[in-house]
Amino acid sequence: MATFSRQEFFQQLLQGCLLPTAQQGLDQIWLLLAICLACRLLWRLGLPSYLKHASTVAGGFFSLYHFFQLHMVWVVLLSLLCYLVLFLCRHSSHRGVFLSVTILIYLLMGEMHMVDTVTWHKMRGAQMIVAMKAVSLGFDLDRGEVGTVPSPVEFMGYLYFVGTIVFGPWISFHSYLQAVQGRPLSCRWLQKVARSLALALLCLVLSTCVGPYLFPYFIPLNGDRLLRNKKRKARGTMVRWLRAYESAVSFHFSNYFVGFLSEATATLAGAGFTEEKDHLEWDLTVSKPLNVELPRSMVEVVTSWNLPMSYWLNNYVFKNALRLGTFSAVLVTYAASALLHGFSFHLAAVLLSLAFITYVEHVLRKRLARILSACVLSKRCPPDCSHQHRLGLGVRALNLLFGALAIFHLAYLGSLFDVDVDDTTEEQGYGMAYTVHKWSELSWASHWVTFGCWIFYRLIG
């Protein structure tokens, strides 16, 4: 890259990565977008409710087949199993628990090679959405937030809602019922779809091109003196951390791509709005990239990574597990997240590490906030908080320190998602040896720092 002139570099970047990536992305998703729009227009015709539910089931089935062909049978089997359990337990007050156990057994059987690993992992996104919707519906029925057990066509319409079945996000049963009512089309709705789709393509391009083009072009040139340090060990360490950060950034933007695309498909199909006095506010937000790339804390990162999933985990997993104690509830929540995302050693290691990092950060900052009477909690304080020190230089410095520490943790954890690993290895999941090797290269730094923070937390108690 260093031998290219600036004009040649950007020309190669445009022709070799940006345009082909954007074109391939649109080729993959245009049919799904068309189906979402068709369903949205169909629901405006004032059809009977059962036909609206049936149409979204048909659209969801077609979308699944388009992306996964006959492998979609595993998603269909899960949805049928969920409704069978819901029907059998329709008079119980523990429907959420029964559905959770059923889904847990089903997913574990799949992870234990009931199905080919690559095939199973290809389906995990759709399986995750079906599982999350079924569990949330079960608990909402138990809590009385949903009055009666939905009919089969309502249940399947919710699970296979065309705007969410492939890329997500999770939406509640109430949001689904609002979507199929066929709310009026508007400029705000179209603007939201266009904005989310444009951001999705931008993130796809950055995720794909940051590794082979952008990162090697900018970082080595700007950091040339740093990388040519006379001390070979220091140079090697810096290169490894830069590579880790490169992998992390590429992985982050691939997640933002899915997040913004799911915003576009869900909104296009008519979901993701709040009702204001005189209009609908199309305000569905899945990810907040700035809160991840420039974080206040790791807690903020975890929340902003996927807002609907964060809400689901908090409302249907963490709150139900709180009777086990706070730390145990945190572990159960991250274990549930690992299972939903598909068990692989590297993913389980990342999520387990996140559980410890976020817990230690939370309790440490809570204690510091109490001792210093300062706004240094993991989450921003409300305007009427009782802390004496809110915006002082020391408070800002401490928050910046924890923000920098969060970026450090993100680079360390993201090093496992190597941009140079082939697709087959990525689909099968990285093994224990790969995970240990990657983190050994970085001297297990994040884990040692977390342990040090925990020791400090205990000492200042």
UniProtKB/Swiss-Prot annotation:
Q: Where is the active site?
A: 341
- A biological process term (GO) from this entry: lipid modification
Q: Which UniProt keywords apply?
A: Acyltransferase, Disease variant, Endoplasmic reticulum, Lipoprotein, Membrane, Palmitate, Transferase, Transmembrane, Transmembrane helix, Wnt signaling pathway
What catalytic reaction does the record list? [Wnt protein]-L-serine + (9Z)-hexadecenoyl-CoA = [Wnt protein]-O-(9Z)-hexadecenoyl-L-serine + CoA
Q: What is the effect of changing residue 341 to A?
A: Loss of function
Covalent lipidation (S-palmitoyl cysteine) residues?
187
What happens upon changing residue 228 to C?
In a patient with focal dermal hypoplasia also carrying a frameshift mutation; uncertain significance
Where does it mainly reside? Answer: endoplasmic reticulum
| One MF annotation (Gene Ontology) recorded for this entry | Wnt-protein binding
- The UniProt transmembrane annotation reads 18-38, 67-87, 96-116, 153-173, 199-219, 253-273, 338-358, 397-417
Which cysteines form disulfides? none
> What domain of life?
Eukaryota
Database matches in InterPro entries: LPLAT_7/PORCN-like (IPR049941), MBOAT_fam (IPR004299)
**Extracellular compartment: which residues?**
39-66, 117-152, 220-252, 359-396
Q: Name one Pfam family in it.
A: MBOAT
Task: Report where it is expressed, by tissue.
Answer: Isoform 1 is expressed in fetal brain, brain, amygdala, caudate nucleus, cerebellum, hippocampus, pituitary, thalamus, heart, skeletal muscle and testis. Isoform 4 is expressed in amygdala, corpus callosum, hippocampus, spinal cord, kidney, liver, lung, spleen, uterus, testis. Isoform 2 and isoform 3 are expressed in substantia negra, spinal cord, heart and lung.
Reported EC number(s) for this entry are 2.3.1.250
- Which GO terms of the cellular component aspect does the record hold? AMPA glutamate receptor complex; endoplasmic reticulum; endoplasmic reticulum membrane; glutamatergic synapse; membrane
Write down the top EC class of this protein.
transferase
Q: Which residues lie on this side of the membrane: Cytoplasmic?
A: 1-17, 88-95, 174-198, 274-337, 418-461
- Please give, as recorded in its UniProt entry, the membrane topology of this protein: Multi-pass membrane protein
Disease implicated: Focal dermal hypoplasia: A rare congenital ectomesodermal disorder characterized by a combination of skin defects, skeletal abnormalities, and ocular anomalies. Affected individuals have patchy dermal hypoplasia, often in a distribution pattern following the Blaschko lines, and areas of subcutaneous fat herniation or deposition of fat into the dermis. In addition, sparse and brittle hair, hypoplastic nails and papillomas have been described. Skeletal abnormalities usually comprise syndactyly, ectrodactyly, and brachydactyly, and in some cases osteopathia striata has been seen.
| Family annotation (PANTHER family) | PORCUPINE, PROTEIN-SERINE O-PALMITOLEOYLTRANSFERASE PORCUPINE
Assembly, per entry: Interacts with WNT1, WNT3, WNT3A, WNT4, WNT5A, WNT5B, WNT6, WNT7A and WNT7B.
Q: What is this protein called?
A: Protein-serine O-palmitoleoyltransferase porcupine
Q: Give the encoding gene's name.
A: PORCN
